C-alpha cells in the first residue's frame, strides 16, 4: 500500500501509508484512478479556461462598418469600383453603444485577399527592405518578378507584397473622450518593434535634413541649393520639392540612384513619407503577411476612454480597389483583452476539448468496469526466448 501512497501523494510518509488498506482500493480504485484522472483533470482545466475566455470575450466592444464590397448589389457610398487611386473621400460614422476603455484599436479588414499564397509572400527582397541598393542577388530578383522593374525603372522595394500595399487613409475627424476632450488616433506603435529594428531600413546612402533657416524655406531652392558649410557642405539632394511635415517645417532628402529607381514614397505619393520610406509603420504592418484570406491589420489606436452614446466620425481617403479580387474592406473600432480582439471561436474551442476529454474519460471508465484489465498483467507480454 505504501507504493500506491507514494504514487498518489509523493513521498513515503506513514501518515498515508496505512489509511487506504481495503482490498477494493488495492484491486480497483487505485489503478482506476491512475488511468482516468488525467481525462477528468484536463476536462476540468479546459472547461474552466473556456468559461473564463468566453467571459472576457463578452466584455469586448466592437463596431464594424463594411464600406466597399464586390458583391454589393447597391454600391456603398464609399465604393470606388475599379477606379484605382481615386483619392476621393467619404465619412464613416459609428455610434458607440457601450463604454469603451483604452486602448481602443482601429483595424481595417480585407476579405478574399490571399496574402498566404506562396507566390505572394515570397515575392519580396528582404535585403532590399534592409537598405541594400546595389547588387540584387539572383534569388531575390527571380522572386520579385514581374514586379522588379517597371518600364526600365527598378522598383524599390520590389515584389507583390510591397506593391499591393493597402493605401486607403483613415482620419478621425470627430469624437470626444469621457472628459470632453477631442479624441486623437495614434498611428505610432502599431508595428512589431523587432521588425522596425531588424527587418526594415532606409536605403544605404539615404539622408535628410531641415531646409535652411530652421526649415522655413519650403520652396524648390531647398532641394536645388548646395550648402557651403556645415555637416552637409557640398552635398546634393535628390528631391524635386521639399517635404513639408507641418507649416514652417520642411525637409530635404537624398535617395541614391533616384533617376533609375522608383522608391516607396514615389509609388505611394501622399501616403508614404519620403522621410520614412519602408520604415513607415503602416507599411511594416502590411508586410507581415496574414495566414488567412480574411484578415485584419492594425491601423491606429486611441488612448482615451469613450462613453456610451458618443459619435465617432472617420474620414476615409479611398484608393484601394477590392473588386479585382472580389473582396471587401471594412473599418473596425474595438476594445481588446489579454487574448486580443473579439474572437467567437476561442472560448468554444476550449469547451469542445473539455467535452472530448469528458467523453474519452467516460468511455474508458465504462470499458474498465465492463472488461477490466489488470495493470502489468504478464499474460499480455509477448517475447521470444533465446
Identify what each model region corresponds to:
Residues 1-16, 106, 377-386:
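Non-transmembrane, juxtamembrane loop and terminal tail segments
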Residues 53-70, 113-126, 323-326:
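Juxtamembrane interfacial secondary-structure elements that flank transmembrane helices
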Residues 2-91, 331-332, 340-343:
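N-terminal leader/pro-regions and domain N-caps
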Residues 51-61, 113, 362-372, 376:
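Transmembrane helix-loop junctions and nearby membrane-interface residues
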Residues 284, 288, 293-386:
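Membrane-proximal extracellular juxtamembrane segment immediately upstream
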Residues 79-82, 92-96, 301-304:
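Beta-strand-rich interaction surfaces with strong enrichment in secreted/lumenal proteins
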Residues 54-57, 97, 107-111, 116, ...:
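Structured beta-strand/turn binding interfaces of compact recognition modules in eukaryotic regulators
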Residues 88-284:
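Soluble non-transmembrane domains of integral membrane proteins
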